[in-house]
């Protein structure tokens, strides 16, 4: 059946109708987004994962909108009130909120004051008010009842009828919505400063901005400050202009009509439109925050791994001591230890801690020490730097330990290290994050990784869905070693679920290393479809068939075999690679029955078998000396690593305890629309110190050389 959303999807997303249709068909056949993006490029016109997801998500939204329209139309028609004009308006509505606005007058309501007044026969009196009848009191006397015993109460009931009708008028509500959106201001004032000891919301104690210009991060800050009771948020309208517009709907005026206007405007329509606009502002702000978190997470997962290094994980603490964990080049735990390197430990204990750390470095030839950035991190860094004066071959890195404690207390960590304390597991996690960030970070709920803004204030369901998509995308783009990956990492591979991933690990434990992709088919519960979706993303480094350690899908093996025969290739040496580089893509693809995009990917994999996408990204900055905030001076040039990107700038680790802020205005000499256009999490950047605030321990940085800023 023809999908009724195709035209709209193609138009909204700037794609061809055929591309949209193909993606929806492939999805309906059970193909995953990573599989479609990597192995069906010719069919989709080379769409990437984000574009494919956008098609799928928007199709769901449009289908939900269309279903609601049909429900609303059927309900209004059942009442005998569906006009051609109303039907056309509902069918043309582009938002669910607009459909609900049009449906409002026909919606089944709970008993209201207007309902009671109508039941008491006061509708004729309401009509007389509109006609500005000269004898309203007398007419009202005739319509008194038990519910409305006096003329005044009857008139008040008639006003209620008019207020309800007037406040449900779609043209009035629509005009008011647009007026507030385009011309009103949103304000905040201080409500209770005692709830804001750190003055986090100081900027919002007396704040005002145009509704239409309010930035997403400000929306979320206003929401949080209001929720905490620190500030009061309100709108500022041109009520005089609104009143004039409403009054123009009445040919004649009287005190009762004036009451109808005031009640409709101030008690009904304005509050309803304010709620709608704040809801829309929040939704847009949440979407922006989620998108930014997703970008940051992707960058963090793609940080280049420090492969083949002996690493010591150092989880700092004051009273309970620092937990150390030595892991070998493969991430295997060698030993753990607890030392007391900082106060309140005695000088004797600190001296012993120095000896213990030095002994570990010597015994295990430690190349890098990974220090968690939590409690006691600054003091621990100074301690490590002091010890490393005797070990010029060893460096240290401050590692973002967000989520390490969450992982350490998880069932997964207990299963992996049942005999270790939570703190020692944290030290292992910190060390492994340096060796292979992706493999370690997938064990942690992405929301706990801490590279977003206001992530706890947004829709948790939507946030989880988007972050899971990012993790899945990165895992499949990088590829997974089927023989070393944890079941958690495997579960993110296209086509694999928790059960199949656990079965792969169990199969390895029982049968030893998997030696070919074909052998993967022997794993219980891994059927033909799962194999098709997963095989190309699973790597086997020591496989007999070199293709098993590439992104080449088994479905293309016969074509590659034919290509090797055609080029007389027996081994992927320099001569073979030269032949592959010299190929005419178009002619060769046609001869092999492959698409050009597929052949292009195959050649890229053959030129670099086992290549890791992350090797093209920045590695962490290695340090040996401690830098203090007091050592910095304005204009000083430094190197640093971007730790977080937010709407108003980016935070950079330059080796002092506090990350420095590069405000968006300091990112370029020209206008920057958003910080993510300039930097990403994990980037190595050259910065200049623009401000040092020792009292508040704050640091401001700039990407602009002060000598060139003018």
Question: What is each PLM-predicted segment?
Answer:
Residues 308-313, 323, 381-384, 516-519, ...:
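Short beta-alpha junctions and helix-cap segments that line functional grooves
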Residues 13-17, 27-31, 40-47, 59-69, ...:
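Conserved NTP-handling cores and scaffolds of large molecular machines
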Residues 39-41, 238, 316, 329-330, ...:
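Short, ordered loop/turn segments at secondary-structure junctions
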Residues 1-21, 28:
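Generic start-of-chain signal for non-secretory N-termini
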């Amino acid at each position: 059946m023809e999908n009724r959303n195709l035209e709209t999807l193609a138009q909204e997303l700037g794609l061809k109708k055929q591309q949209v249709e193909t993606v929806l068909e492939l999805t309906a056949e059970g193909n995953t987004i990573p599989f479609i993006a990597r192995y069906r490029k010719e069919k989709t016109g080379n769409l990437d994962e984000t574009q494919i997801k956008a098609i799928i998500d928007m199709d769901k939204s449009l289908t939900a909108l269309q279903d609601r329209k049909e429900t609303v139309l059927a309900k209004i028609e059942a009442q005998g009130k569906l006009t051609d004009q109303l039907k056309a308006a509902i069918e043309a509505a582009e938002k669910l909120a607009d459909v609900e606005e049009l449906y409002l007058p026909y919606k089944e309501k709970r008993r209201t004051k207007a309902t009671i007044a109508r039941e008491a026969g006061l509708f004729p009196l309401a009509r007389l008010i509109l006609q500005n009848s000269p004898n309203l009191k007398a007419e009202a006397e005739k319509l008194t009842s038990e519910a409305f015993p006096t003329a005044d109460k009857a008139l008040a009931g008639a006003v209620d009828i008019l207020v309800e009708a007037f406040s449900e008028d779609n043209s009035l509500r629509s005009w008011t919505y647009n007026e507030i959106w385009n011309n009103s201001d949103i304000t905040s004032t201080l409500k209770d400063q005692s709830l804001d000891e750190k003055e986090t919301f100081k900027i919002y104690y007396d704040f005002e901005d145009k509704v239409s210009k309010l930035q997403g991060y400000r929306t979320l800050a206003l929401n949080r400050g209001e929720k905490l009771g620190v500030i009061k948020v309100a709108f500022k309208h041109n009520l005089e202009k609104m009143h004039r517009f409403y009054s123009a709907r009445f040919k004649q005026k009287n005190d009762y009509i004036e009451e109808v206007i005031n009640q409709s405007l101030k008690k009904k329509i304005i509050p309803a439109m304010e709620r709608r606009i704040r809801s829309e502002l929040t939704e847009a702000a949440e979407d922006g925050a989620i998108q930014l978190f997703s970008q940051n997470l992707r960058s963090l997962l793609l940080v280049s791994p420090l492969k083949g290094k002996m690493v010591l994980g150092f989880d700092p603490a004051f009273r309970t001591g620092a937990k150390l964990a030595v892991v070998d080049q493969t991430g295997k735990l060698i030993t753990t230890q607890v030392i007391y390197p900082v106060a309140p430990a005695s000088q004797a204990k600190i001296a012993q801690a120095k000896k213990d750390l030095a002994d570990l470095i010597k015994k295990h030839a430690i190349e890098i020490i990974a220090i968690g950035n939590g409690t006691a991190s600054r003091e621990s860094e100074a301690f490590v730097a002091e010890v490393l004066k005797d070990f010029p071959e060893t460096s240290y890195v401050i590692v973002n330990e967000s989520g390490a404690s969450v992982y350490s207390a998880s069932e997964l960590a207990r299963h992996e290290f049942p005999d270790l304390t939570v703190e020692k597991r944290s030290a292992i996690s910190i060390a492994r994050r340096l060796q292979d960030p992706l493999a370690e970070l997938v064990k942690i709920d992405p929301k706990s990784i801490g590279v977003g803004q206001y992530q706890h204030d947004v829709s948790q369901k939507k946030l989880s869905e988007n972050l899971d998509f990012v993790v899945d995308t990165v895992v499949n783009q990088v590829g997974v070693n089927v023989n070393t990956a944890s079941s958690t990492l495997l579960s993110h591979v296209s086509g694999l679920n928790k059960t199949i991933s656990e079965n792969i690990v169990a199969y390895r434990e029982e049968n030893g290393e998997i030696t070919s992709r074909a052998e993967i088919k022997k794993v219980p519960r891994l059927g033909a479809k799962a194999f098709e979706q997963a095989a190309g993303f699973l790597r086997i480094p020591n496989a007999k068939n070199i293709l098993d350690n590439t992104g080449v899908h088994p479905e293309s093996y016969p074509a590659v075999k034919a290509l090797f025969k055609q080029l007389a290739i027996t081994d992927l040496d320099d001569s073979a690679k030269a032949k592959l580089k010299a190929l005419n893509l178009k002619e060769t693809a046609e001869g092999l029955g492959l698409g050009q995009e597929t052949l292009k990917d195959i050649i890229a994999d053959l030129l670099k078998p086992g290549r890791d996408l992350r090797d093209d990204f920045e590695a962490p900055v290695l340090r040996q000396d401690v830098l203090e905030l007091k050592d910095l001076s304005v204009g000083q040039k430094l190197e640093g690593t971007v730790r977080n990107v937010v709407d108003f700038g980016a935070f950079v680790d330059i080796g002092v305890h506090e990350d420095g802020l590069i405000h968006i205005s300091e990112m370029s000499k020209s206008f920057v629309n958003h910080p993510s256009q300039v930097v990403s999490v994990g980037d190595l950047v050259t910065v200049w110190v623009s401000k040092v605030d020792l009292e508040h321990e704050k640091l401001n940085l700039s990407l602009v050389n002060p000598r060139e800023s003018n």
